[in-house]
């Protein structure tokens, strides 16, 4: 019975997925999608964890807090990019080609992650 109720709730959430009006509702719907997927694959540990996350979102989520957290992530990633740029500059000073290539790769990864974060409209 629990399974049928959870499935019905999940399917309802999936059908209403395009109607999210707030960030918290969007987050809740994403968790419900994950629950549906976990139920499909009979992953009870994942279902339990997602149900706990869903309870937390329903109890504590606020759009302003999500925006603030997102801005913190962006600031942290900008610091990461700056650190990677510094590491690359130091590697170039030393002239070690292997380290330069490694630092360039890490810088590119950090910059890509920053772009993804900035593209998310919170």
Swiss-Prot record:
Q: Which UniProt keywords apply?
A: Signal
Cleavable signal peptide: 1-20
Superkingdom to which the source organism belongs: Bacteria
Where do the record's region annotations for Disordered lie?
65-100
- Give the species this sequence originates from: Escherichia coli (strain K12)
Q: What is this protein called?
A: Protein YqjC
Here the segments flagged for biased composition (Basic and acidic residues) are 66-100
């Amino acid at each position: 019975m629990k399974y049928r109720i959870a499935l019905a709730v999940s399917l309802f959430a999936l059908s209403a997925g395009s109607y999210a009006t707030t960030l918290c509702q969007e987050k809740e719907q994403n968790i419900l999608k994950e629950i549906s997927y976990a139920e499909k694959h009979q992953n009870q540990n994942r279902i339990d964890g997602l149900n706990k996350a869903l309870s937390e979102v329903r109890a504590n989520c606020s759009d302003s807090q999500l925006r603030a957290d997102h801005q913190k992530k962006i600031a942290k990633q900008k610091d990461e990019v700056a650190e990677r740029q510094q590491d690359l500059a130091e590697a170039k000073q030393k002239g070690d080609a292997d380290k330069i290539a490694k630092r360039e790769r890490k810088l590119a990864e950090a910059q890509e992650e920053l772009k993804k974060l900035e593209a998310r409209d919170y």
